[in-house]
Amino acid sequence: MIELSRVAKSFGKNHVLRGVNLTIPRGQSMVVIGGSGTGKSVLLKSILGLVTPDSGRITLEGADVREANRDAFLARFGMLFQGGALFDSLKVWENVAFRLMRGATKLPKDEARAIAIEKLRRVGLKPETADMFPGELSGGMQKRVGLARAIAAEPEIIFFDEPTTGLDPIMSGVLNALIREIVIEMGATAMTITHDMSSVRAIADRVAMLHDGLIRWTGLVSDMDQADDPYLQQFIHGRADGPIESVR
């Protein structure tokens, strides 16, 4: 379980997070939504330890993440980055196995390659893809490679940063279904940040809306459409009028 208690972060006079409280239950898929510039990325980076909050506490299974051994802490995570973040100079299998051959794991090359090919198969890519380079793949295939890398080390927790960015609606649907399937299969805890409502409905067990540096609403995805928060309803239905627009 990941818990955030009154987490705040400012950059100069820009108060990005204003005291965020959020619980991500073990084995659940939490999707954090909100408009551009609402602090979703800062929230994610705070959990990962890439940004240090000004105040508040973030715990993983009750332990403060700031006091954890960093290598052991990060070894529990997998992540699918928004832009893929693949290394163009490495073959596909080397991208997938990157963590496996480094850090505390340091698997032999042959073993790491075998795991990489297995994970590529799991995300629907043929074994021959392993010896290609990222630049030879379509955007959708690159996203699948990124997903294979995220799950290669069998992480307990997987983060997804705008997973469908740059994909057409059909490929977005395929990737969303694949993410949901894999998270359930692995029994992983997942956190996704996105503004793509198709991802929300396909991936989430629970949803949290971040607005003006605070969690305005959180609950089951099945309760989202009936929630009485006007900001949430404006966002999920894509309306340009109403409370969100009026405060800008």
Across the structure, where does each feature detected by a protein language model lie?
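Short coil-to-helix segment of the ABC ATPase nucleotide-binding domain corresponding to the Q-loop/switch region
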Residues: 90-98
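ABC ATPase NBD coupling module
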Residues: 65-78, 109, 224-227
